Amino acid sequence: MTDFFKDIPAIRYEGPDTENEFAFRHYNPDEVVMGKTLKDHLRFACAYWHSFAWPGGDPFGGQTFERPWFGDTMELAKLKADVAFDMFERLGVPYFCFHDADVRPEGDTFAESTKNLEEITDYFAEKMDATGVKLLWGTANLFSHRRFMAGAATNPDPEVFAYSAATIKSCMDATRKLGGENYVLWGGREGYETLLNTDMARERAQAGRMLQMVVDYKHKTGFAGTILIEPKPQEPTKHQYDYDVATVYGFLKDFGLEGEVKVNIEQGHAILAGHSFEHELALARALGIFGSIDMNRNDYQSGWDTDQFPNNVPEMALAYYEVLRAGGFDTGGTNFDAKLRRQSLDPADLILAHVGGMDACAAGLKAAAAMLEDGKLEAAREARYAGWSEGLGQKLLTSDLAEISDLVIAKGINPQPRSGRQERLENLVNKYL
């Protein structure tokens, strides 16, 4: 272990009454819920970028964090890895996630950047063997460098498309080498600032071609993980093409990839798109493309994607209810795509932020499991649609408009509204929180 987190103990479960801030109150990794441990249900992962690469800047000010690993050398990249895996061990998280740019210095050429990535992932492999920590997913940063200012796959310059494709290949290779369970595509610059200089049809076709190549390369190389798209409506672009789950599904259908690609849904991105987190999860489940989640929260007053650590247990209970209804995670998990506030300078802040987030998620999942096991919500849902399971409902599904019109006249059908009982169900949910 490094000395960055010196005097901070390994985090253990001590129960809800503990006064020890460096302990879990709700997350007992070995606790069995619905036949599975919380560790296996939640599949926690730490995000390398926010925890170890973000300098603490915002649109109005620069760096506030002073980390001993900040710099552009392989030596510092390895120090960063030492500290990262130290934190993973102290928290007991089973997974981590990274972009290429988070973990290796940028080279003067693509070949040099790739060599740096290969070297640091060799170092990661040693760390992973020593600690047992695994890779939930890898991805490519195709949005920070100025070459990507007009997009990656959707860029008007074919050379940027080529550079992006090569970068994705190198990151998929790194993910496969480390046994990553997913590969994520987030199109931060895959959108537009103005329609005045944008050929949307062309850009959409380019994005489709890139995704097809990603899927082809997955099969060619035998990558056993899941390809995931992470929706977001805007920021940093005015409009992003993978706006939300529904938009992504339409895109996948258009290119015949709905059976190949799933979604990684972020709480903050759902809010930016005008949805609740549970809406996006429920829709992904209904469409058969639910894959993984990025857990965080937004400041609802500012309207920005603030990437704060989650702390709202009722919100998380409703989210994990949809995750459990989807059968839980397969290759996916709960990645903390969350960052400290820029005034939270101390090493302890980074540990405590994750402790609080993990506890809140555990409390939310246990509440969701209790709701599901109790069965009252599902029973109410089934009762509401019971008419479609027999008799008239089944007949309507195999009839045409003329037949149904004749039926309404013959039977004198004159339907009367029934209560949706929303308040009753909301009261029921509060019983478990």
Curated annotation (Swiss-Prot):
Signal peptide: none
Cofactor: Mg(2+)
Record field: catalytic activity: alpha-D-xylose = alpha-D-xylulofuranose
Gene of this entry: xylA
GO cellular component: cytoplasm
Listed GO biological process terms: D-xylose metabolic process
NCBIfam families reported for this sequence: PRK05474.1 (NF003998), xylose_isom_A (TIGR02630)
Species this chain originates from: Roseobacter denitrificans (strain ATCC 33942 / OCh 114) (Erythrobacter sp. (strain OCh 114))
Keyword terms: Carbohydrate metabolism, Cytoplasm, Isomerase, Magnesium, Metal-binding, Xylose metabolism
Paired cysteines (S-S): none
Subunit note: Homotetramer.
Protein name listed in UniProt: Xylose isomerase
Compartment annotation: Cytoplasm
Family, as annotated: Belongs to the xylose isomerase family.
Active site, renumbered: 99, 102
Keyword Transferase (UniProt): no
Cofactor note (record): Binds 2 magnesium ions per subunit.
Binding site for Mg(2+) 2: 266, 269, 305, 307
EC number: 5.3.1.5
